[in-house]
Design a protein with these regions (language model features):
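Short acidic, gly/pro-rich beta-turn/loop elements at beta-sheet edges
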Residues: 119, 135, 161-162, 211, ...
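N-terminal alpha-helical interaction blocks
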Residues: 1-92
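Long, contiguous hydrophobic alpha-helical segments, chiefly transmembrane helices and signal peptides
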Residues: 108-109, 113, 150-154, 166, ...
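N-terminal [4Fe-4S]-dependent radical SAM core
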Residues: 70-153, 167-171
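Conserved AdoMet/S-adenosylmethionine-binding subsite of the radical SAM
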Residues: 181-291
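Generic secondary-structure signature for well-ordered alpha-helical cores
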Residues: 111-114, 162, 166, 279, ...
């Protein structure tokens, strides 16, 4: 397909610093390596809905270690990925089960509202059980490494920034459109087929919708890197579930350790949460920081 690309979006592919910091992302983008979610879908997980949450977290921790080993092997030999059959239950399925449980006592973000979203209760972000989408399009205004970017803007946010550029989305000035995981997966595939370099999960804020995103990528059958485009105000549990799922963490670093975060964005303890999540993201994937 013919398209007009920004010159910096072309030049960045040859930039040595960009290749050093985002080398795996570029390889997935060019189908030379496999996106994390696709590897997670091939990794066998043995668990039951009868298992306690503590037991499931332990299994998830063990599988996360195994995932990194398997990813390392597949990065060297992509053919190994094709040889492995899809198991009845996978590492990705385990993540979906864990996220389902979090919905009953919601703590995807650091506010830990603890509402049961499966019963229709709403917390600070006002996100319910079914994901609502504002818009889906090929974005040409992101960082050069990302464009054209397959952006999916979901409703709601875990913060309330007075300077928010997407206020109508984050604060529910729009109704949004409900998407089932299978339908949203088709949108992701269409964006990729049309030349988008990635699936850019944004909003608002993607954090409240992590369960729905995990369920969506269970049905995506194209190799596409996932960009987790977040305000970084998410919980340790969300950070664990993002391991082996997000290829690139596109994270905000909005504030220092003073009172600005709470005054401007209603985000108490932002500095501590933000620092911890950036350090964790740097260990688990590749990182782009917005300041």
């Amino acid at each position: 397909m013919w398209r007009l690309l920004r010159s910096d979006a072309v030049a960045v592919l040859g930039d040595e610093r960009a290749k050093k910091s985002l080398g795996r992302y570029f390889a997935v983008m060019q189908d030379q390596k496999i996106a994390k979610f696709m590897i997670a879908r091939k990794l066998l997980a043995e668990f039951s809905e009868e298992d306690s949450t503590e037991e499931l977290w332990q299994k998830h921790e063990d599988l996360t270690r195994e995932f990194h080993e398997v990813q390392g092997e597949m990065d060297v030999d992509v053919e190994k990925f094709r040889e492995i059959p899809v198991p009845e239950k996978s590492y990705l399925d385990l993540k979906i089960e864990m996220a389902n449980r979090i919905l009953r006592n919601c703590h995807f973000c650091s506010r830990r509202c603890s509402v049961n979203r499966l019963e229709g209760k709403l917390g600070y972000c006002r996100c319910g059980q079914e994901v609502k989408v504002s818009s889906i399009f090929e974005h040409m205004g992101e960082e050069p490494e990302l464009v054209p970017s397959g952006t999916i803007f979901t409703m709601g946010c875990t913060m309330r920034c007075s300077h928010c550029q997407n206020w109508t989305i984050s604060q529910w000035m729009e109704n949004g459109v409900v998407y089932k995981p299978e339908k949203l997966a088709k949108e992701v595939e269409e964006l990729r087929a049309n030349g988008c370099r990635n699936a850019n999960l944004v909003g608002g804020e993607p954090t409240p919708w992590l369960q729905q995103w995990l369920a969506t990528f269970k049905h995506v059958n194209m190799n596409v890197p996932i960009v987790w485009n977040s305000n970084t105000y998410y919980s340790p549990e969300t950070a664990q579930l993002l391991a082996g799922f997000a290829d690139v963490y596109l994270l905000d670093f909005k504030y220092g350790p003073g009172e600005c975060a709470e005054k401007i964005s209603d985000a108490p303890n932002y500095w501590a949460v933000c620092v911890k999540n950036h350090l964790e993201a740097n260990k688990l994937g590749e990182l782009i920081i917005r300041v």
